[in-house]
Curated annotation (Swiss-Prot):
This is DNA ligase. It is an enzyme of class 6 (ligase). Keywords: DNA damage, DNA repair, DNA replication, Ligase, Magnesium, Manganese, Metal-binding, NAD, Zinc. Zn(2+) binds at residues 408, 411, 426, 432. It comes from Photorhabdus laumondii subsp. laumondii (strain DSM 15139 / CIP 105565 / TT01). DNA ligase that catalyzes the formation of phosphodiester linkages between 5'-phosphoryl and 3'-hydroxyl groups in double-stranded DNA using NAD as a coenzyme and as the energy source for the reaction. It is essential for DNA replication and repair of damaged DNA.
Length: 672
């Protein structure tokens, strides 16, 4: 048995080596037939000795049973998108913004890569073995596609080499090469199956197959470009060196990567890739530019849902002329009011375009656009059509000025536009039909009202069936009504009803956060709760009173005032408090700037399990004593409070030499 086990392991090592040469190095040493012979030999031995089969064996890429549905995966570190630039002037502006923020007068060292047109995925390796794969999803929550990812030959089931971290999350793009895409569509036409519009759709559809045997037949490829979770190990201090390290571990990395030391080199690389684009063999839609130094990346940080240290330098899109027949106003899921031009249909980049975004009122004014104008349409990033110019010399005499509405076209609430902000927004967040699903998802989320079992698909059904229109309606649901939803039995329905009842007892800070007031995150909600103590006092506060609160500036103050003066929102809040009975323990009113405590002015991170206080209670007490409680450890963190089973945050704190105390010490300091 020992010699058989050794023979099996030798075959696995040999096969992994040849997979690496084929997929990563693009330099196979043996014919496909010899690889197939070795694989068959391993399969035969594993059939004889099934007790010797391991999950990372090359034979185990396929074999999982079809799924009923994909389970949700919450990304421990969000998978953010990138901001875009579309021309040299915009890129130089990005370069200047970065240098200004870093107070650098010289050009920065950056790493340029291809922007692949595929599907972003997360690969989690533990002790070198692939244990989970997930889609990007909305950046916070994706889908578990482990069984499908295992079928892609380019993705190693086990990393090899030296210095592999105990836990590392590799991020990259799954895509379908053009030859494989064409062959797939040829076969689809022959059999009468669905024909895919483009390689990206084909890749996405292939990864979302419930049966991994179907995915295994699709010609998918993969390149990695970054890392998320990193525990129990170290990586090089530059992005480029990290890519080299990934390749050493057996992960495929594009060979179209260049380190540039000035902005002109970046622009030259961009034009080189534009010229090579058609010969690459797979779709790309631009070049990604990243600050090479990880230290500088950390200093630059993030804005909204994108890093400040990277941008996507997109390719120019094809343009066409057409006529604007009308302008309508759409309401997005976050309340953004977007003007949309209704166009005389025209073909752009092979697609018939009849609508185009106008972004906002400023853009309409900048363009000088009127209804009836002849305009130039571009498919920005090859995806979203937009108006980029107006041919005023073709303007008809009966053209009409575009009038921006004062009230939401969906719910009738006031439209808010803060000075200095381009986007106008509906203020009826708690009642607006266009925002309903997003508002309800946020309201029941773990960090808000924390309604266990109330997932995204349940919210979708409740809204689609018109069972729920406002957050208060959730608490009026019965087990009988919930049982009528898909995949909701009597026991599950009762559990949701019980969870809703439990959620009525909350904290002032959680309730404020759950309302979804623009720019009011967890920390700001906690500061508002600690400062005002009572909901009525907060509702009646003016901008000047709000600006006295820690971390509340003019913009946030305006959002809060506008939210609470909107009559529709007032009705829903009164309903939640007076009729539903949402309640919380009285809050001790504090003024953080006047407090003399060990935590005053400190940025604090909580990690691990606490036993004497709940996490909410600990946060509230810390905020009340002037602390700013955040969710991640960085160089700006002043103190980490580590409970039981603290993990990566504690490790990072130790790495950065940030002071760490335990729960007992926190309790002692809270009493001072």
């Amino acid at each position: 048995m020992k010699s058989t086990a050794q023979q099996i392991e030798k075959l696995r090592t040999t096969l992994r080596h040849h997979e690496y040469l084929y997929h990563v190095m693009d330099a196979p040493e043996i014919p496909d037939a010899e690889y197939d012979r070795l694989m068959q030999e391993l399969q035969d031995l594993e059939e004889q000795y099934p007790e010797l089969i391991t999950s990372d064996s090359p034979t185990q890429r396929i074999g999982a049973a079809p799924l009923a549905a994909f389970e949700q995966v919450r990304h421990e570190i969000p998978m953010l998108s990138l901001d875009n630039v579309f021309d040299e002037e915009s890129y130089l502006a990005f370069d200047k913004r970065v240098r200004d923020r870093l107070k650098e007068t010289q050009d920065l060292v950056v790493c340029c890569e291809l922007k692949l047109d595929g599907l972003a995925v997360s690969l989690l390796y533990e002790n070198g073995e692939l244990v989970r794969a997930a889609t990007r999803g909305d950046g916070t929550t994706g889908e578990n596609i482990t069984s499908n990812i295992r079928t892609i030959g380019a993705i190693p089931l086990r990393l090899f080499g030296e210095n592999i971290p105990a836990r590392i999350e590799i991020r990259g793009e799954v895509f379908m090469p053009q030859k494989g895409f064409e062959k797939l569509n040829e076969e689809a036409r022959r059999t009468g199956a669905k024909v895919f519009a483009n390689p990206r759709n084909a890749a996405a559809g292939s990864l979302r197959q419930l049966d991994p045997r179907i995915t295994a037949k699709r010609p998918l490829a993969f390149f990695c470009y970054g890392v998320g979770i990193l525990e129990g190990g170290e990586l090089p201090a530059s992005h480029y060196e990290r890519l080299i390290q990934f390749k050493k571990w057996g992960l495929p990395v594009s060979d179209k990567v260049k380190v540039c030391t000035d902005s002109q080199q970046v622009i030259d690389f961009y034009h080189d890739i534009v010229n090579q684009r058609s010969a690459l063999g797979f779709d790309i839609d631009g070049v990604v530019v990243k600050i090479n130094s990880l230290e500088l990346q950390e200093i630059l940080g993030f804005v909204a849902r994108a890093p400040r240290w990277a941008t996507a330098f997109k390719f120019p899109a094809q343009e066409q002329m057409t006529i604007v027949r009308d302008v309508e106003f759409q309401v997005g899921r976050t309340g953004a009011i977007t003007p949309v031009a209704r166009l005389e249909p025209v073909q752009v980049s092979g697609v018939i375009v009849s609508n185009a975004t106008l972004h906002n009122a400023d853009e309409i004014e900048r363009l000088g656009l009127r209804i009836g104008d002849t305009v130039i349409i571009r498919r920005a990033g090859d995806v979203i059509p937009q108006v980029v110019g107006v041919l005023e010399e073709r303007r008809p005499q009966d053209s009409n000025v575009v009038v921006f509405p004062e009230h939401c076209p969906v719910c009738g609430a006031d439209i808010e536009r803060i000075e200095g902000e381009a986007v106008a927004r509906c203020t009826g967040g708690l009642v607006c039909g266009a925002q309903r699903k997003e508002a309800l998802r946020h309201f029941v989320s773990r960090r808000a009202m924390d309604v266990d079992g109330m997932g995204e698909k349940i919210i979708d059904q409740l809204v689609d069936k018109e069972y729920v229109k406002t957050p208060a309606d959730l608490f009026r649901l019965t087990a009988g009504k919930l049982t009528g939803l898909d995949r909701m039995g009597p026991k599950s329905a009762q559990n949701v009803v019980d969870a809703l009842e439990k959620a009525k007892k909350t904290t002032f800070a959680r309730f404020l956060y759950a309302l979804g007031i623009r720019e009011v995150g967890e920390a700001t909600a906690a500061n508002l709760a600690a400062h005002f103590g009572e909901l009525d006092k907060l509702r009646s506060a003016d901008e000047e009173a709000l600006k006295e609160v820690q971390d509340v500036g003019e913009v946030v103050a305006k959002h809060v005032v506008n939210f609470f003066i909107e009559p529709h929102n007032q009705t829903v809040i009164d309903d939640l408090i007076d009729d539903i009975g949402i309640n919380w323990e009285p809050v001790v009113v504090t003024r953080a700037e006047k407090i003399d405590s060990p935590f005053s002015g400190k940025t604090v991170v909580l990690t691990g399990s606490l036993h004497q206080l709940s996490r909410d209670e600990a946060k509230a007490k810390l905020v009340a004593l002037g602390a700013k409680v955040t969710g991640s450890v960085s160089k700006k963190t002043d103190l980490v409070i580590a409970g039981e089973a603290a993990g990566s945050k504690l490790a990072k704190a130790n790495e950065l030499n940030i002071p760490v105390i335990d729960e007992e010490e926190m309790i002692r300091l809270l009493g001072e």
